[in-house]
Amino acid sequence: MEEELKQQFDEMGVEPADAVLGRCAELAITYNIHDATEFVEQWMAFSLSHLQGEDPAIENLGDFERKVLQLRKDKAGYKATGQKAKSYGSPSVQDTSSLATYGVMEDDPMLDDYVSESAVDSSALHTPKAKKQSDRTANLKGAALFSPASYTPQSAKRKAGLETPSNSVAGKPGDIVDTFGHPKLLAGSSWQSQMEHTVPVTQKLLHNDAPLTIANLGYMNDLLTDRCHNLRVRFNQTGPALVDKKLGQAGAAECIWYPQDRQVLQSAGGLHAVGMIHSEDDGPLDAHSAFMAVLDDDVEDEMDPTLTLNFSRVKSASIFPGQVVLAKGFIPRGKTFMVEEIHTERKLTPATPLQIDRELQFVVASGPFTDSTDLFYEPLHDLLKYLKDHRPDVLVLTGPFLDADHKMVGELAETFDTFFEKMIGGIMESIGSHTAVLVVTSQKDAMALSVYPTPPPALRRTYPNLYMLPDPSLVDLDGFTLGVTSTDVVDHLLSHEFAVNAGERMHRAINHLFHQGSFYPLYPPADEDMAYDSQLALKYAQLKQLPNVLILPSDQRHFIRLVNDCLVINPGRVADKKGGTFARFLVAPSVPGKAANMFNSVACQVQRI
């Protein structure tokens, strides 16, 4: 028996001492458990439910005997037939099965896992079932909101990490690491909602009056001809706007343009061209790899529309692949365009003035929500504890929630959809009905469709205050416009742009989104694994009007920037090796007689978790 037990424990990644194996064999014989696999499975479920995945030891085997084995024996003794139980119920397809999930369930139903469902005399003496814990986030170690079903014991997962991210954390939880807003507004806020108020949520990124959902999604049909057409649409929308901003209609009429006036290569006023930036190798740009595709409906299709760009004369520039620009310069010979000026700004449609009549409290947090070495989701539990104490009006969560590249994803013994449902259920249970919860999943999520823009996954259970949003999203919250994405477009832009004397990098990356009118203006995408769909992007990723606040999660350092009177926030990552962070901000109602502006109306902080 000991050898069989040792083999089963080995398969679970557990190496108990010989004395412990002897005690396990003794317990198995005493309680008529003749199958080593059954004994080990019962121990693993008990360990993960009560001991946070500890390995078996002489001390905790005593608890196991009292709470599981003895209880099972008592139950069997009170059966109407008087016969000993030889089966403890078949595994259920529900999440409550101990064989399907070694996790903590809502009511911790150990009896349901180990004892058959036959009737039991209510007057029998037995160990009472533990009461449901009311404060599930008060003690992280003692009460998990949800636990992943796994083929590998949690203790083995914990040992797999040689160093936990917290070992290199700078600062302590609760530290404020970034701030924006009027000092009086910051000092006067308790960062708690003052009254219960239902915040209406209305999606504004629509096509044919409908947001992006799985029901109206048609993808994997992005033909090359369609991509070319969609790029031309972007060109035709942005190019004239750049010309109008810089030159105006009258000024544009006086300029010499390429390719219409391509015969006039030398001119006193310079040559102008509107085109789309590309890279020779589809990678990051540099001073020698950029070329510009110039399109014009009046020029024959046979003409080569590309110009190689030379930046030796330029004083300031910031370009990236897929960007539509207005360039000024000359062509000394061949197809080389000597750039003297490059213009990328157009007239922007400003955000709708703030129209709220009461203070709104927001919390914004971005995934990943668990460390890279385990699936315990401890940073998420810490965040939920903060939310339970502060009760904001709106909570914005962006993915990834279950990163498909996480090293432990392959150990899950349940579907990704089921795991995500459990996670959302735990979040909603902890937060309650007071807070409106906006969830924006990522195409990096294992349970999400791998396409950008990304529709929200469908949930079997609905909650009145839960809003599953696509990536990207633009929503109206009681007169306040919020833009949000889970895609790291800031990092993608900065890693692929070519910049010369272009100013502060975060500011210019944000401006790229505004002036290109897109949540993701790069083409081709910076991430090779990103399944970019140009047709969906044309319908559901345009940024035609500035929001009041824009959420741009990024692996770049957390930041708060005011750009074109839009407050842009990178809250950082909840789980980060250098210490997780999240953002909180409040929007105050306008004071009668005073002009509303973001500095006086919005206060924001990034806080360490």
Swiss-Prot record:
The modification Phosphothreonine is found at T164. Its main location: nucleus. The modification Phosphoserine is found at S155, S166, S168. Phosphorylated in embryos until cycle 13. One of its GO terms (molecular function) is DNA binding. Keywords: DNA replication, Nucleus, Phosphoprotein. Expressed in embryos (at protein level). Disulfide bonds: none annotated. The keyword S-adenosyl-L-methionine does not apply. One of its GO terms (cellular component) is nuclear envelope. Gene3D superfamilies: 3.60.21.60, DNA polymerase alpha-primase, subunit B, N-terminal domain. It comes from the Eukaryota. One of its GO terms (biological process) is DNA-templated DNA replication. It is found in: Nucleus. The keyword Phosphoprotein applies. Component of the alpha DNA polymerase complex (also known as the alpha DNA polymerase-primase complex) consisting of four subunits: the catalytic subunit PolA1, the regulatory subunit PolA2, and the primase complex subunits Prim1 and Prim2 respectively. PolA1 associates with the DNA primase complex before association with PolA2. Accessory subunit of the DNA polymerase alpha complex (also known as the alpha DNA polymerase-primase complex) which plays an essential role in the initiation of DNA synthesis. During the S phase of the cell cycle, the DNA polymerase alpha complex (composed of a catalytic subunit PolA1, an accessory subunit PolA2 and two primase subunits, the catalytic subunit Prim1 and the regulatory subunit Prim2) is recruited to DNA at the replicative forks. The primase subunit of the polymerase alpha complex initiates DNA synthesis by oligomerising short RNA primers on both leading and lagging strands. Belongs to the DNA polymerase alpha subunit B family. This is DNA polymerase alpha subunit B. The gene is PolA2.
